[in-house]
Regions:
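Outer-membrane beta-barrel translocator/receptor signature
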Residues: 69-72, 83-161, 167-171
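Soluble non-cytosolic domains of exported or imported proteins
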Residues: 6, 14-18, 117, 154, ...
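Acidic, small-polar-rich N-terminal luminal/periplasmic segments of exported/outer-membrane proteins
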Residues: 1-105
Length: 276
């Protein structure tokens, strides 16, 4: 059986969601996990996945924390999905539908958030008319990360201009460019003993602020042509070209016997060019 939950932009703004994990916590049938401190990792019906993510129906499986500043809605599907997306999944998928320019309208929406740890978030969403049958929409996002743990900090920057052209009453063209620049400290948490975290170590960070770092720089070009076939059907042609450069390196507690903590670490660079 399949079930779908849809979280809209209004829901995201009203609840103050800032990342995929925030949405997952409010969605039945799925859970979120740590993702080693550098990526979205969702558990669909008991099976963890870092790959079953889509953007406008196109696979988006590079491992990073996805921002919500340019999202119109998030679709969470639990159940079989190979016929819908051309590949099998672990038990579900998450599809982000991005914001498109609105022809004939001019508006600007500003969001600002801050928490008690000093983290802050700023987002601007502006749409303006460029012609009788065209419009441009620009979304910009920047945040500074902080929490209760020592050394934890980071920043994220996102820019996404979109142009919409209404070619005819039946045909619409959307062209999008997205740039992302992320950096953050990696905190893998504290050791466990007998299946539970050792709370006596809760104030200790097992890592090095000069080593436990992840960075991401990405550019994504998207083009989509939508043609209305009838009152109940339409045809879509989507093309995505993207480039990702990501670095993930960390030290973490790999073993603990109650008195001695064993440390380990690794370096994981990713360079990915996609054309879909």
């Amino acid at each position: 059986p399949q079930t779908v939950s849809i979280v809209t932009d209004d829901d995201i703004r009203r609840q103050g969601f800032r990342q995929i994990g925030d949405i997952i916590r409010y969605t039945p049938g799925v859970n979120t996990s740590q993702g080693e401190g550098h990526r979205d990792a969702v558990v669909f019906r008991g099976v963890r996945s870092t790959a079953d993510f889509f953007q406008d129906g196109i696979r988006d499986d590079v491992q990073y924390y996805r921002s919500l500043y340019n999202v119109e809605q998030v679709e969470i599907l639990r159940g079989p999905n190979a016929l819908l997306f051309g590949r099998g999944g672990t038990g579900g998928i998450i599809n982000r539908v991005t914001k498109k320019a609105v022809v004939g309208e001019t508006f600007t929406v500003n969001d600002f958030g801050v928490d008690s740890f000093g983290a802050s978030d700023v987002a601007i969403d502006t749409n303006f008319v460029t012609g009788p049958n065209s419009a441009m929409r620009i979304n910009v996002h920047s945040d500074d990360l902080a929490n209760h743990r020592d050394f934890y900090d980071g920043s994220r920057l996102g820019i996404n201009p979109v142009v919409t052209l209404v070619v005819s009453p039946e045909t619409t063209v959307n062209l999008s460019y997205e740039y992302a620049d992320h950096e953050r400290f990696i905190d893998r948490g504290i050791p466990t003993i007998n299946g539970r975290p050792d709370e006596s170590l809760s104030d200790i960070v097992f890592g090095d602020p000069d080593i436990n770092v992840t960075t991401l720089e990405a550019t994504i070009f998207r083009g989509m042509v939508s043609h209305k076939l009838s009152e109940t059907s339409k045809a879509n042609l989507s093309v995505t070209s993207s480039s990702f450069e990501k670095l993930y390196q960390n030290l973490y507690a790999s073993g603990y016997d109650g008195t001695l903590v064993t440390m380990d670490g690794y370096l994981d660079p990713t360079e990915r060019d996609n054309f879909i």
